[in-house]
């Protein structure tokens, strides 16, 4: 596994290189896409990106947890969590990339 993290600036630069928009336009395009995705998720809508995966928001109910230091029971409040499900194509791409790094051995 790699420790490399791709940042917004790097994504914006990749859009600039690939699409040929100006750097400012590339950054604006990336921000618009991310704003649209996050806005839809905030409303509770699912976001499906073909050949990539789907994002959805799931509600988790209240439950009882335990403080690991004291063993005391603690209520955990209900909340919404973000869920990402990769597409089969993305899973295959990732697994093929891992196999190539290991020299083709599975």
UniProtKB/Swiss-Prot annotation:
InterPro entries linked to this entry: Hist_DNA-bd, Histone-like_DNA-bd_CS, IHF-like_DNA-bd_dom_sf, IHF_alpha
Keyword terms of this UniProt record: DNA recombination, DNA-binding, Transcription, Transcription regulation, Translation regulation
Entry GO MF terms: DNA binding; structural constituent of chromatin
Pfam families, alphabetized: Bac_DNA_binding (PF00216)
Signal peptide per UniProt: none
Gene Ontology terms: biological process: DNA recombination; positive regulation of metabolic process; regulation of DNA-templated transcription; regulation of translation
PROSITE patterns: HISTONE_LIKE
Highest taxon of source: Bacteria
HAMAP family: IHF_alpha
Subunit note: Heterodimer of an alpha and a beta chain.
Name assigned to this protein: Integration host factor subunit alpha
Encoding gene (name): ihfA
